[in-house]
Amino acid sequence: MRRIRRGHVLLAAVAAALCLPASGVSSSSDNSTITKVGKTEGQLNLIAWEGYTYKQWVNPFVKATGCKVRSKFGGSSDEMVTLMRTGQYDAVSASGDASLRLIFGKDVRPIDPKLVPDFKNFIPALKSPSHNTVKGVHYGISLQWGPNTLLYNTKKVKPAPNSWSVLYSSKYKGKITVPDNPIQIADAALSLSRSKPNLGIKDPYELTEPQFKAAVDLLKKQHSLVRKYWATAGDEIDLFKNGSATVGASWPYQTNTLQAAKAPVKDLIPKEGATGWADTWMISSKAKHPNCAVKWIQWVSTPKVQAQQAIYFGETPANTKACAIMDKLSKGSCAQYHANAPSAYFRSIKFWKTPTKDCGNGKSNCMDYAKWQQAWTDIKS
């Protein structure tokens, strides 16, 4: 998935210079759990979404730790996985559609969450989520998250929708927009879990062949109704501003940006619930600067940095203590991004995770991510 706030990707140059490992965490290829942090190495090479390494919180980190941050912005989850497997980077801000690929590929190391003091303040749903925690082992620390919401033009879409079914309705042919992402198959599966309960869909990311086929068929029917598959938040904002789209799958950032521009839009979590993304900082099993990587995770988990990033990028912090700081930085932002939402809100969200053959019931007859990628190409053809 492309997780870019603005309309294009900026690539930051990453130097190839590598420092010798310091004591503490070993920097050799290692999949053992990180349980302590030693002397920092003076450098940190990151793969991140654009906006995740902004100077507002990076510069104070460098000053406090001596770890100079060099970041490369990833254009998609697939690109991030590829970059991590080069062994040239220390950590990555992986979304849920990438994290399990890195875990099962042994590309990342487990980390003891006790190393992160603010972990205790995280929302329960993001302490040990299935997209970064396997059999009780934490392969990263959650960072920020956001739901996939149903966005609509209040003047054009009437009555106000309460179901994802509106995205599959011929009534709005040519005015529908959805993300250009294979994980969109999960959104179709979530809709089918309510409209066709006989399919037996319990988890939209664990689909047997018949369930998968039903979701893909629904999306193929939707294809002729779609005005555009959007790649960035800016793409969708433009579609709603110029009237090309009146209803679509979205994120809170788009809604807030459009409402600030006085566009007649609202969003909601439909009755079926919603999918959602959640990012995790994960440390490479080949990290050359692992101690700096741990320090970075500790830093970006603090309430102040979480609040700064949430407002800058347009997302929701994992740390519940960030809410008050968000409102000080931008009045009402805590509620805007659901940082103070009740537990029922989180339960309605099915966070992204990489589809695998494992169906979670001891069987291995689910469709893996490669099948999802191929199907998405077929859907759009």
Cite the ranges covered by each PLM segment.
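Early extracytoplasmic/lumenal segment of secretory-pathway proteins
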Residues: 30-102
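Extracytoplasmic ligand-binding site segments that recognize negatively charged/polar headgroups
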Residues: 47-48, 52-55, 93-241
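Paired acidic/hydrophobic, glycine-rich loop segments that form the ligand-binding mouth/hinge
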Residues: 90-94, 229, 246-251, 267
